Curated annotation (Swiss-Prot):
It comes from Solanum tuberosum. The keyword Transport applies. PROSITE patterns: PHOTOSYSTEM_I_PSAAB. The lineage of its organism: Eukaryota, Viridiplantae, Streptophyta, Embryophyta, Tracheophyta. [4Fe-4S] cluster binds at C559, C568. The gene is psaB. This is Photosystem I P700 chlorophyll a apoprotein A2.
Length: 734
């Protein structure tokens, strides 16, 4: 018999129903469950797939560069970054009528185009790219890297080049390589690029390979480095009147600590960023030489962890046993990596708008909104994934004997206390926050707004003041001109920093009031509830009082039949599934808050946010309804405009989202009946019944239907908000 899909599971391949296809797709990447898998092949497959992933990333980024060079307007944007709309790529659509062609022909283009809201123009401009030729060169280089990655992936699957399991489990070598080789060297290389190419470009000097060795980044070259006069590199920075990209007002410094923003570009000083990357490079290059490999010196990770036994014995055996537990579990390692990456991605979202690194990006409001929202959603999915793999670790890889009385075992031993505390925090936050919102809502509805309960966030205001914000009147730390902290930084970074914090045109330490206090606690409710569901799912993954043998059923099971009532919805997968809804809900509140606060700031009517954000109807009417009105006006006598595509996407997003409920609310029996009726009709319809299928059609399993429903819910939710966000922002600010 010919091999049928899936080849990795002979049991599934012989299944006579459509379950073969869906289960095959569902388990395609679960290498551990495949036939004939060995630990060695598992590690090698994952290693090779990493190169495939890199190839895809390089190909994708190469495509960005190529399409902007081919169809964009980078060179004219460079001449006037604040007024020319950056073009992502052309739109080719044979169905377009003349009104559509006119509506989407903008940014100086000859035909319909998409505007770029990704910030790539600002990024490329900041790092020294200036011409389409530069972009083509970059695209070709990335294409080359993509090909190299594919070759490397293929190579490491060949018998002679397959790494051994011991190589994959050599923790110290991997740490040294990643810390020094990847983070350290790449940060140093980036410092070099900023100093040799980007900073000269910001001062009107065009450095490329042909003059790279002739143009000194600093008048004194390497002299100050070798004579120990490093402070010379910080002297004579760009002046506050510097015009970015020209020599006018430019200085000669390359590594500075100015603080604050470049007055014209509203972004961090390039020389500050070069200095930052040099410091990061130094730290990581040192860190990457700390672990014991070939020379018998340095730390051993196992010794480090085994030595971590807290004195007093109150935390048992501390970190004993953790080295082997982590080093032998890919799910544990993936969980740690995803947790770290998720937090970093969220930090990127927060810092990209408050401390913009790219020239002129702060004045491109739609791009700011899109990048914040994009990174927060990505962070949410990555963080929930961390807990999913944590749960799979507990089910598949955790060994109680190996971890007796260490911190991991103790987490499991007192999971009831952890879960109940999280539950208490969620309930407290939920009832109090909703209570305040509802009270205020009723007061507004009855025409007595003065009876609202409005709480000033005094602790947060105090923290902002400690960092130098003076408008609240707290005389503390950096907002106190007499304090030692103020005087210590006065001669270096502090003037630039204080200027940035107290200038109301940027997003650094926005002024906060009762509306912020309330939405902060609503977001805290969402974060704690999402965490509660995820933590409970992982800690109860092996078993609970209700179902002590849960680990024997695996990661995702629907129920243990009718014999044990109450075992439905308690698999670790079900916890992940529920948590994703809460994650999306929370990030919805986060992005609503960020976007509304910023559009009122950009429009100069902050009082709208301050007055309307303290009650629910304010959010519904003055944020959601008011800003979606352009997207829901249907056909009008003015015909098509450039927001029409977002109006369509807004509608389509709602459709996809609503489709999710079809899978979430009706289960197998309903679908099985429907499928059998459809199959009956098909077999009795002339012509149609000439088409037969080999697999008997059966309904999706409960778990699969939930996954399909969750996927539609998530995609529709994000599509809808993306269209709303981009249209409402670009409709106001271009």
């Amino acid at each position: 018999m010919a091999l049928r899909f899936p080849r990795f599971s002979q049991g599934l391949a012989q299944d006579p129903t459509t379950r073969r296809i869906w289960f095959g797709i569902a388990t395609a990447h679960d290498f551990e469950s495949h036939d004939d898998i060995t630990e060695e092949r598992l590690y090698q497959n994952i290693f090779a797939s990493h190169f495939g992933q890199l190839a895809i990333i390089f190909l994708w980024t190469s495509g960005n560069l190529f399409h902007v060079a081919w169809q964009g307007n980078f060179e004219s944007w460079v001449q006037d970054p604040l007024h020319v709309r950056p073009i992502a790529h052309a739109i080719w659509d044979p169905h377009f009528g003349q009104p559509a062609v006119e509506a989407f022909t903008r940014g100086g283009a000859l035909g319909p185009v998409n505007i770029a809201y990704s910030g790539v123009y600002q990024w490329w401009y900041t790092i020294g790219l200036r011409t389409n030729e530069d972009l083509y060169t970059g695209a070709l280089f990335l294409l080359f890297l993509s090909a190299i990655s594919l070759i490397a992936g293929w190579l490491h699957l060949q018998p002679k080049w397959k790494p051994s399991v011991s190589w994959f489990k050599n923790a110290e070598s991997r740490l040294n390589h990643h810390l020094s080789g990847l983070f350290g060297v790449s940060s140093l290389a980036w410092t070099g690029h900023l100093v040799h190419v980007a900073i000269p470009a910001s001062r009107g000097e065009y450095v490329r390979w042909n003059n790279f060795l002739d143009v000194l980044p600093h008048p004194q070259g390497l002299g100050p480095l070798f004579t120990g006069q490093w402070n010379l590199y910080a002297q004579n920075p760009d002046s506050s009147s510097h015009l970015f990209g020209t020599a006018e007002g430019a200085g000669t410094a390359i590594l500075t600590l100015l603080g604050g923003f470049h007055p014209q570009t509203q972004s961090l000083w390039l020389t500050d960023m070069a200095h930052h990357h040099l410091a990061i490079a130094f730290i990581f290059l040192v860190a990457g030489h700390m672990y014991r490999t070939n020379f018998g010196i340095g730390h051993s990770m196992k010794d480090l962890l085994d030595a971590h036994i807290p004195p007093g014995g109150r935390l048992g055996r501390g970190h004993k046993g953790l080295y082997d537990t982590i080093n032998n579990s890919l799910h544990f390692q993936l969980g740690l990596a995803l947790a770290s990456l998720g937090v970093i991605t969220s930090l990127v979202a927060q810092h990209m708008y408050s401390l913009p690194a790219y020239a002129f990006i702060a004045q491109d409001f739609t791009t700011q909104a899109a990048l914040y929202t994009h990174h927060q959603y990505i962070a949410g999915f990555i963080m929930t994934g961390a807990f999913a793999h944590g749960a799979i670790f507990f089910i598949r890889d955790y060994n109680p004997e190996q971890n007796e009385d260490n911190v991991l075992a103790r987490m499991l031993d007192h999971k009831e206390a952890i879960i109940s505390h999280l539950s208490w925090a969620s309930l407290f936050l939920g009832f109090h926050t909703l209570g305040l919102y509802v009270h205020n809502d009723v007061m507004l509805a009855f025409g007595t707004p003065e009876k609202q309960i409005l709480i000033e966030p005094i602790f947060a205001q105090w923290i902002q003041s400690a960092h130098g914000k003076t408008s609240y009147g707290f005389d503390v730390l950096l907002s106190s001109t007499t304090g030692p902290a103020f005087n210590a930084g006065r001669s270096i970074w502090l003037p630039g920093w204080l200027n940035a914090v107290n200038e109301n045109s940027n997003s650094l330490f926005l002024t906060i009031g009762p509306g912020d206090f309330l939405v902060h606690h609503a977001i805290a409710l969402g974060l704690h509830t999402t965490t509660l569901i995820l933590v409970k799912g992982a800690l109860d993954a092996r078993g609970s009082k209700l179902m002590p043998d849960k680990k024997d059923f695996g990661y995702s099971f629907p129920c243990d039949g009718p014999g044990r009532g109450g075992t439905c919805d308690i698999s670790a997968w079900d916890a992940f599934y529920l948590a994703v809804f809460w994650m999306l809900n929370t990030i919805g509140w986060v992005t609503f808050y960020w976007h509304w606060k910023h559009i009122t700031l950009w429009q100069g009517n902050v009082s709208q946010f301050n007055e309307s954000s303290t009650y629910l109807m304010g959010w519904l009417r003055d944020y959601l309804w008011l800003n979606s009105s352009q997207l829901i006006n249907g056909y009008n006598p003015f015909g098509m405009n450039s927001l029409s595509v977002w109006a369509w996407m807004f509608l389509f997003g709602h459709l996809v989202w609503a489709t999710g409920f079809m899978f979430l609310i009706s289960w197998r029996g309903y679908w099985q009946e429907l499928i059998e009726t459809l199959a009956w009709a098909h077999e009795r319809t002339p012509l149609a019944n000439l088409i037969r299928w080999r697999d008997k059609p059966v309904a999706l399993s409960i778990v699969q239907a939930r996954l399909v429903g969750l996927a539609h819910f998530s995609v529709g939710y994000i599509f809808t908000y993306a269209a709303f966000l981009i249209a409402s922002t670009s409709g106001k600010f271009g």
